């Protein structure tokens, strides 16, 4: 928007704000904190007036252009200017040329640019038009400028520097020793810094400071960055706190579930107690002599190792001692031959035929060696189940035969006693003679058989065995 400018401003050809007289400060504002704004404006006006008086219009124009570039009102131009300043700085730092050569080159370039400008912009074409516009009109930006101007930044920096100098003077007056120590330490620091860091780097840092400080100061970039970082930190803090609280809640819930599970396991263990495998194996072990080592196999069975074999009722170990005892006492029992030949006197006294007895004795003498060999083998070797059954059946037959013989003997004795009481004495003599005849005849036949077979010694042994067997049967059947 353009509007007619005042005549005094147009005739002088400078901004209106520069020629305005400084407004006198109010005492209340200077004393209070509210007077900081007017003081800055007054300082900015004074700085602008001093620059105008010292440098003139061209330099002042360059200052305003630098203000626009350094305030980053137009970011693209400011960025290009920043890159150009960096290139120029490193060119001056790395080139072997001297300073006056560079200054002459810069002046020559400025002259060439001015000549070109004069050739392009003819005074005859646009000078009058340009002068009329600048005299009658003034360009006014209707948009309020919220950004601080470079002059204001310079004024604020000057005020801060002046306040720092005043404070340092007061500190020097109050404690000169501390002030001297502070100045010496600062000078020593810069000396060490200059010895380690080249001056080129320090100059480049000053250039960066000149470009970036207005950017952060005038555009409030630092405040914006601080607000964003603060919001991020707050979100991060809130997120970390929420995460920690969530972990605490999960841990407390896990502890509660664990305690509840432990209580339930205790209840179950009280109802269903656990049985140890070793205790169960010891209880299941059958042997009473030595505890076997028990191991639990993969298929769920017990494995007995390095122990005695469990004893059962059907085991051969139980049968073996009984067989030994039975075979040891077997010689005391009468055999079939002994049972039939034990009561020779009784048979003779009863009047049995002697011829049958003679034939039986011959058969017994023929079969006795084989039976003795079998009995010796039975005593020396362990008996099998069928042999034991056969032996028991033979023993049962012998016992039955002996019992029947004893019963018949008792009956015959009773009948003989009755006959002896009734019969006369003469009859007894004749019977006695007939018995003697039979005995003499029997003895002669026996001697003949013994001479033929040569069994005199066997007969003596048989007589002794018959006596023993008769004594055993008499003892066994004495109660009948």
Swiss-Prot record:
A Pfam family recorded for this sequence: RHD_RETREG1-3
Knockout-associated phenotype: Leads to an expanded endoplasmic reticulum.
Family matches, as InterPro entries: RETR1_RHD (IPR055255), RETREG1/3 (IPR043384)
Keywords: Autophagy, Endoplasmic reticulum, Golgi apparatus, Membrane, Phosphoprotein, Transmembrane, Transmembrane helix
Region (Disordered): 1-41, 302-380, 451-480
Chief location of this protein within or outside the cell: Golgi
Similarity section: Belongs to the RETREG family.
Protein name, UniProt field: Reticulophagy regulator 1
Organism encoding this protein: Mus musculus (Mouse)
Record lineage: Eukaryota, Metazoa, Chordata, Craniata, Vertebrata
Gene responsible for this protein: Retreg1
